[in-house]
Curated annotation (Swiss-Prot):
The keyword Cytoplasm applies. GO terms for cellular component: cytoplasm. Catalyzes the ferrous insertion into protoporphyrin IX. It is found in: Cytoplasm. One of its GO terms (molecular function) is metal ion binding. Pathway: Porphyrin-containing compound metabolism; protoheme biosynthesis; protoheme from protoporphyrin-IX: step 1/1. Fe cation binds at residues 194, 275. Pfam families: Ferrochelatase (PF00762). GO terms for biological process: heme biosynthetic process. Its main location: cytoplasm. This is Ferrochelatase.
Length: 318
């Protein structure tokens, strides 16, 4: 009897450099920032700016930041995504589980090719973006749709979002409670989501509404009052207006108004990465300390059992 799974779950994260070095970071950023879903400027104008100005400057600077959070096993985002895939495989023995990156390695299209070579008949693609955006989830959808033309015999579903999924919300809420039990509870809980250019939201991207729905669902699960939490957006890039309120200035204003301690969680990130570990856990903590306040960072769900069980349940329902 053949017991080899013919259904696969493919979890896809954003991507990461292969090492915390300027050349590796430049290669990664070149691929990431060349995606028209990410930067909509026509290539004729964008490429000279990207290769002539942005990569030479950001490559070394970003490499220094990656070096601060790099793990012995590699990039935090890759390490935790790989471990999460292993946890999913453990709770889904009747499925084959793989992981891939939209940018960098393991490349999404190559991973889809490997699944086809294994004889997989059905693939559920789960982008590790709880909230949908045309700049993230849709980019994965683009790659999958292009690949489908070469593999019409394989059924493929792409999960679009899980911003209010009950299992995921419960896992986030429980991770916050567990953090409070160990570290104590601060005066205010901050939800920090990755930012997005305001023009993208104005064009109809549902991301900000989904971020708000995620925060509200977690707040409801925790039973918090309106004065006990705040949300904002981080990781702004460039000079144009992004979604507001900006997370870090919001924290500063609250600190200057008398709030002395904050807990902070990033529900838009499935796994910890540069933006959560270096920008938030280190950077926000430093600037708040200058204002007489403290920040206690609550890690992402990463490869926790609760995370694996929540995602597995989503995949089985797809």
């Amino acid at each position: 009897m053949n017991t080899t799974p013919d259904t696969a779950l493919l979890v896809v994260n954003l991507g990461t450099p292969e090492s915390p070095t300027a050349p590796a970071v430049r290669r990664y950023l070149a691929e990431f920032l060349s995606d028209r879903r990410v930067v909509a400027i026509p290539p004729l104008f964008w490429k000279p700016l990207l290769y002539g100005v942005i990569l030479p400057i950001r490559g070394p600077k970003s490499a220094e930041k990656y070096a601060k959070v790099w793990l012995p096993e590699g990039s935090p985002l890759a390490v935790y995504t790989r471990r999460l895939a292993g946890g999913l495989q453990a709770v889904m023995p009747d499925w084959h589980v793989e992981w891939a990156m939209r940018y960098g390695e393991p490349a999404l299209r190559k991973t889809l090719d490997r699944l086809r070579a294994r004889g997989i008949k059905r693939i559920v693609v789960l982008p590790l973006y709880p909230q949908y955006s045309t700049t993230t989830t849709a980019s994965i959808q683009d790659v999958v749709d292009a690949w489908r033309t070469s593999a019409p015999e394989i059924a493929v579903e792409v999960i679009q979002d899980y911003c209010e999924d009950t299992g995921w919300v419960a896992a986030i809420a429980e991770s916050i409670r567990a953090h409070w039990q160990v570290h104590g509870r601060s005066e205010k809980l901050m939800f920090s989501f990755h930012g997005l250019p305001q023009r993208v939201a104005d064009a109809g991207d549902p991301y900000p509404q989904q971020c708000e729905r995620s925060a509200q669902a977690i707040v409801a699960a925790l039973g918090l009052g309106a004065d006990e939490w705040q949300m904002g957006y981080q990781s702004r890039f460039g000079a144009e207006r992004w979604l507001q309120p900006y997370a870090e200035p919001t924290l500063w204003k609250l600190a200057e108004g008398g709030v002395r301690s904050f807990d902070l969680v990033c529900p838009g990130f499935a796994t910890d990465c540069l933006e959560t570990l270096e920008e938030v856990a280190l950077g926000f903590s430093e600037t708040l300390a200058e204002r007489g306040a403290t920040l206690s960072y609550i890690p992402c769900l990463n490869a926790s059992d609760a995370h694996a069980h929540a995602l597995a349940a989503m995949a089985r329902r797809a």
